[in-house]
Regions:
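Core alpha/beta catalytic barrel or barrel-like domain that forms the active/cofactor pocket
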Residues: 105-108, 146-157, 200-207
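Generic N-terminal targeting/processing segments that precede catalytic cores or assembly contacts
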Residues: 1-102, 233, 240-281
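Active-site-proximal catalytic alpha-helix in oxidoreductases
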Residues: 112, 155-172, 194-199, 217-224
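Acidic-glycine-rich active-site phosphate/pyrophosphate-binding loop
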Residues: 81-98, 131-150, 195-203, 238-241, ...
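Alpha-helical support elements that line or immediately flank enzyme active sites
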Residues: 117-128, 174-179
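Alpha-helix capping and helix-loop boundary segments enriched in small/acidic/polar residues
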Residues: 78, 107-110, 154-162, 210-214, ...
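Functionally critical mobile loop/hinge segments
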Residues: 176-281
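Conserved phosphate/anionic-ligand binding catalytic regions in large, soluble enzymes, centered on
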Residues: 101-119, 161-166
Length: 281
C-alpha cells in the first residue's frame, strides 16, 4: 500500500505520483516513461479509429460493427452530447477491436479496455485544452491504488473489479483533465465504482463480447456523470479506498457462477444458451 499512502498524504497530483512510481519501478528516465505512455496512447487512438472506420465483426457473430454504427450516427442532436456520445462510440469501437483480436491496451483489463481511452480521447478532441499524457498517468495511479488494495480480476471479484475499476480510473482522470483537485478526483472514482459493487461477470459463451462491450459504453457515461458531480462539489460519503475494499470483499462473496465461468446470470438465459450451442457445439 506504499503508493496508496503517498496519494493520500502527498500534496502532489495523482499523475505526478504515478509518473514517479513508474520511473522508480522501471528504472528509466522521466522522458522515457512519458514517451512510452505516448506510444500506448497512440495504440489506443489507433484502436478507436479502426473500430469507428471499419465494421468489426467476430466469428461468433456477436460483434457486428456497433462502434462504426454509433460513430456514424453522432450529430449535434445526439442525446448524450458530443463528448459523452463520442466517448461511448470510441469505447465500443475499442472493445470490438479487442474482441476481433486487434491490438489494444488493457486499461486495466482487456475486457474493460474501451472505457479510459474512450472517455479521454473524446474529451481531448472536444475540449482541446491539454495533452492527454498526464490524464493517463492519473488513470494509472487510480489503477495502482486498486491493484494494491484489491484486484482487477473478474474471476476473483466479478465485473465490479474490471468495469468498476475502469470507470473509477476514467472518472478521476476526467476530473484532473478539467482542472479538479485530487480530492475531487478521488471522490469521482468512489462515486463511479459504487455503481458496480457486486456486478456479475457473466459473459455469453465465455467470450468477451456480450455483455462486456456494451458495459464499456455504459461505464463511459458513468465516468462523465461521476466526474461532473465531483467537479461541482458533490462528495462521496464513503472514501475511495473504502469503496475499493468493499468492491473486493463483496466481489469475492459472489458465487463462482457469477465470476467469469459463464455458469450464471446472462450466460445461462435461454437465448444465451442457444448462442453458446451455435458457437461451441
Amino acid at each position: 500500500m506504499e503508493f496508496t499512502q503517498k496519494v493520500l498524504r502527498s500534496e502532489k497530483p495523482i499523475h505526478e505520483l504515478a509518473l514517479e512510481y513508474e520511473i522508480n519501478y522501471a528504472g528509466k528516465s522521466r522522458a522515457d516513461i512519458r514517451s512510452e505512455m505516448g506510444r500506448r496512447i497512440n495504440v489506443m487512438r489507433d484502436a478507436a479509429l479502426k473500430g469507428t472506420e471499419q465494421e468489426i465483426r467476430t466469428r461468433s457473430g456477436l460483434v457486428v460493427g456497433n462502434g462504426k454504427k454509433l460513430y456514424s450516427s453522432l450529430s449535434e442532436n445526439s442525446l448524450t452530447g458530443p463528448i459523452v456520445g463520442k466517448g461511448i462510440a470510441y469505447a465500443v469501437a475499442i472493445a470490438e477491436v479487442n474482441a476481433g483480436m486487434g491490438v489494444i491496451v488493457a486499461t486495466p483489463t482487456a475486457g474493460s479496455c474501451g472505457v479510459v481511452p474512450g472517455a479521454l480521447i473524446s474529451l481531448e478532441e472536444n475540449l482541446q485544452s491539454k495533452n492527454l499524457t498526464e490524464s493517463f498517468f492519473t488513470a494509472s495511479g487510480i489503477g495502482l491504488i486498486i491493484a494494491e488494495n484489491a484486484t482487477f480480476a473478474a474471476a476473483v471479484a466479478g465485473c465490479g473489479a474490471e468495469i468498476g475499476s475502469s470507470a473509477a480510473m476514467a472518472s478521476a482522470s476526467i476530473v484532473e483533465y478539467c482542472g479538479g483537485s485530487k480530492k475531487q478526483a478521488l471522490d469521482a472514482a468512489a462515486i463511479s465504482m459504487k455503481s458496480y459493487l457486486g456486478l456479475a461477470c457473466d459473459p455469453v459463451a465465455g467470450l468477451v463480447e456480450v455483455p462486456c462491450i456494451k458495459r464499456n459504453a455504459i461505464a463511459v457515461a458513468n465516468s462523465f456523470a461521476s466526474a461532473e458531480m465531483a467537479l461541482s462539489g458533490v462528495e462521496s460519503a464513503i472514501p475511495f479506498l473504502e469503496v475499493v475494499g468493499a468492491m473486493h470483499r463483496l466481489g469475492k462473496k459472489l458465487p463462482s457462477s457469477l465470476r467469469e465461468t459463464s455458469r450464471g446470470g446472462l450466460a445461462v438465459t435461454k437465448t444465451a444458451l442457444k448462442i453458446r450451442s451455435r458457437i461451441l457445439d
